[in-house]
Amino acid sequence: MIMTHCNRFIMLFALLLLSFTAAAHPIEEIETEATDTTILVDGVQVTAVKQGMVLRSEPIASTIVGERAVSRNQISALKNLAEMVPNLHIPDYGSRMTSSIYVRGLGARIDQPVMGMTIDNVPLMQKNAFDMELSDIERVEVLRGPQSTLYGRNTMGGVVNIYTLSPFHYEGARLQLGYSTGNTFRLRASFYEQFNDKWATSVSAYRTTSDGFFKNELTGADTDWEKSDGGRWKLLYRNNKGLRIENTLSFAETKQGGYPYAFLGGRSEGVTNADGYAVTPGQIAYNDSCRYERLTLSDGLTIQYETERYSLTSITSYQFTDDDMHLDNDFTPLDYFTLQQKIKEHVVTEDVIFRSKGDRRYHYLFGLYGFYRDQQMEAPVVFKPAGIDAMIFAAANQATGGRVQMHALANMPLDSEFDSPAYGFAAYHESSLRFGKFEAKAGVRIEHEQVSLDTHGSGTLKYALKVGAMPFPMEQEPVVLETESSYKQDFTEILPKLSLIYRFDENRNLYASFSRGFKAGGFNTQIYSDVLKEMLQAQAMGGAYEEKDIMSYDPEYSWNYELGGHFSCAEGAIRGDFALFMIDCRDQQLTVLADASATGRMMTNAGRTRSLGGEVAMQFKPWRALDIDLSYGYTEATFRHYIDGENDYRGNYVPFAPRHTLSAGLTWTIPTGVKWLGDVVLHGGMKGVGKIYWNEANTVSQPFYTTFNASVRLEHKNYSLDFWGENLSDTEADIFYFESIGNRFVQRGRPRVLGITLSINIQ
């Protein structure tokens, strides 16, 4: 099977190589214009301070989405962008807290992300804040493959660089109003002003409200409602001596429901609650509230000094996150247990980059990076009497054959408090040497990180005991638990990379690269309530708690081998990128249940996985008015060695990572000839993803499925009016699946969505 796929990739690679030859014999010249599609943006744009001037001439698999493409495709969040990028999958489930990212077979549901994210060169350190509203975006760069040498921790799958609009590039005011299915309303407003050739500023704000798409059938309430507000203030300075200063202050507040998980079946099926409501497959029905609230505040200061020979850049940031999650953690009408998780986090980062400039054979880059994080978390879990009897006492009562019966008398609160400071620092370097049409690059990063965890747990269990022929249960002395513990982990990593690129010309090249990726280890705070529960249970039954080594997990490593290229032919009418890759991943981090009775998730390390795959992104412009975009990614990510203590999963597919991603779009621009009307832009597209396995045993899966979208846009330099639709085929698909306390749950994808968006530019 693997050899068959490899042969297909070799054939694809050979066909793509022919495009380089075809460029020597172009077809009839076609008038083209520089467009900001997913392949190419205006050549004057400058990429991140750590990359080259033009990403398509670098040995990197990348996708660039410009301002016009962001607007035309209604991209308002990172998960919308992922649908345009091959081998990138960001499912929209749970709430904005669940920012799970999967790329090239790598990814995880909780804790450390596999991809990094920067906004105006400032790294986002809290994964919970990745899913945010994107407004006034100038362009987005998605770099795939390990970027650990330049970007460090948690970028082994790549990095997403987002750049917001600069008041030096645009002056005026913007207003956007949108309404769509689900009673979803969006309002955005911004103002850009350049005072003189040195100073400029911008202010922007947004508000989003939505009733959502799913209802709780028990209460009749909307489950995935949302209210979000935010704003950004940028102040820029530049002089004619090479100095540039940019400060960006931003905040965002989100309040939402979320977690529309439907019960599929399991041990609770048919069980009725105190009101006689039965747990029924296919229903979203839970009795306690599920909601999420988040407040973020960040300030990023970039100071850059440039000469003809070098540039020196300092990027300093402060980030504050305060979020609060509430869950009916059994997701049923039964009174079992609830969870709250509150996180307050302060982060300070500093990155200093010194790099050479100019047209020279040898270039260099040196960097120093450091961060400090102070995080406090509270995670109280409350087990209710019905939940205690069903989840804790049931097995013990059954084991005695009914001779001894234990029953809960009151709620059992399990309070967990965590203090988790962390710090890290790194030094990195990259050298490049050009000889003829070849350019070789070599880089290395030395990174050290230390993370600590201090825990405090407490709980109280009140119960009654009935033995034999006793006429009634007797209340027992409450079991009281108070415990503290401390953990610490240190990581010191050396992250090298090598690449060689051959440039046929400025638009066509081939490259080969080799690099090491790294994802930090950490602590399993979500499983801590299970530890407390088992401690209380052991005390109540007169036994001893057997401590398990489950509170921490190790870093994840990968060796990445990649062969790819960028091409352009037929006078620029055909442009594209392609890559073949193999990723040998060691200690891959997987989200699992500790055992069948566990209520929380934990991260564990699989022995070894391997990802083989390829991806291609192309743009065709047969004539000026027509654009055709196509991207496809294939990944075969399998376990090479993973035994969970009972089962050997060798050869099985890694769960949650799709095997195929597909995106295709056609845009036709029709000039109306009416000055005040502008152009009519017709767009149609298709997106596909799958097959996705939901567990390590590969017994549950979502087949490959497609959704269709379309829009009609009136586009003028001063305004645009969009009539758009997503999932027009109303495709039903599962986007998330999980099992908990013997039950199975799923979240379906959104139904058909229709909307209208009005944008106004006043210049």
Predicted regions and their residues:
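Extracytoplasmic beta-strand/coil segments of soluble accessory domains associated
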Residues: 62, 79-122, 138
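Outer-membrane beta-barrel translocator/receptor signature
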Residues: 99, 126, 135-138, 149-217, ...
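Short acidic/polar hinge/loop motifs at secondary-structure boundaries
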Residues: 120-146
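Periplasmic-side early beta-strands and strand-to-turn transitions of outer-membrane beta-barrels
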Residues: 169-170, 178, 190-288, 321-335, ...
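Solvent-exposed loop segments that connect transmembrane elements
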Residues: 215-221, 259-285, 330-337, 380-415, ...
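Membrane-embedded beta-barrel scaffold of Gram-negative outer-membrane proteins
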Residues: 302-327, 509-515, 526, 532-605, ...
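Gram-negative outer-membrane beta-barrel transporters
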Residues: 365, 437, 573-585, 602-695, ...
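C-terminal beta-signal and adjacent terminal beta-strands/loops
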Residues: 687-695, 713-763
